[in-house]
Amino acid sequence: MVGRAVLARLTADKNSAYAVVHILGRRAPELPAGAPSARLVSHVSKSLLEAQVPPADDMFIALGTTISVAGSQSAFRALDLDAVLALARAARAAGVRRLGVVSAMGADAGSQVFYNRVKGEMELAVSALGFDTVVIARPSLLDGERAALGQPTRRGEQLALKVMRVLKPLIPRNYQAISDTQVAKALVEAVLAGRPGVQILLSGQMQPR
């Protein structure tokens, strides 16, 4: 979801930071309404582990799934760690200087929780590749339209979203549900700001004030 929201933000008429936006994925993207096709170049690669990244200044990676959707821990790791790292390495080799990547709240390479551990390992790996700027977004539960992307309905997630909306005043900001558009906004703005080094955006920091 965040990837779609990032694309919409990068192609909005008011955003003139990028003359050309390259879109890399396993299938051709559904472009946002009104997106200027003259500024878009789509690259489809069946294997993201072998994808070729064109020369660019910045790159945004918003790959992610769940263990239940992936089918196994190894399949989850292949996408959320291996594919993300492969793309980041290819981007660095292509001359990309600034990287924005979507992770998750709770990411910790030393965690006993498999999901959190893989996310943490991914963060450490991409941070060590030598980019001038790395921005890592750690959203809590994402609130957005999965159906529009052809993603399966996650019943437990839908129930959690309903509960979190009702109890929002009682939930710490870092663990409140957050919209995909808000994550995209914060991530793009932070990458464009270009602060040197590694910057982590916690979910509460990305929530609207």
Summary of predicted features, one role per range:
Residues 24-28:
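N-terminal Rossmann-fold cofactor-binding loop
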Residues 14-17, 33-35, 129-130:
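Short helix-capping segments at alpha-helix termini
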Residues 1-16:
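N-terminal Rossmann NAD(P)H-binding glycine-rich loop of SDR-like oxidoreductase domains
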Residues 19-22, 135:
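Conserved beta-strand positions in the Rossmann-like core of class I SAM-dependent methyltransferases
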Residues 1, 71-73, 78-124, 128, ...:
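Conserved Rossmann-fold NAD(P)-dependent oxidoreductase catalytic core, especially the SDR/UDP-sugar
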Residues 56, 109-209:
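Oxidoreductase cofactor-interface core, primarily capturing Rossmann-like NAD(P)-dependent enzymes
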Residues 37-86, 90-93, 191:
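NAD(P)H-binding glycine-rich loop region in Rossmannoid oxidoreductase-like domains
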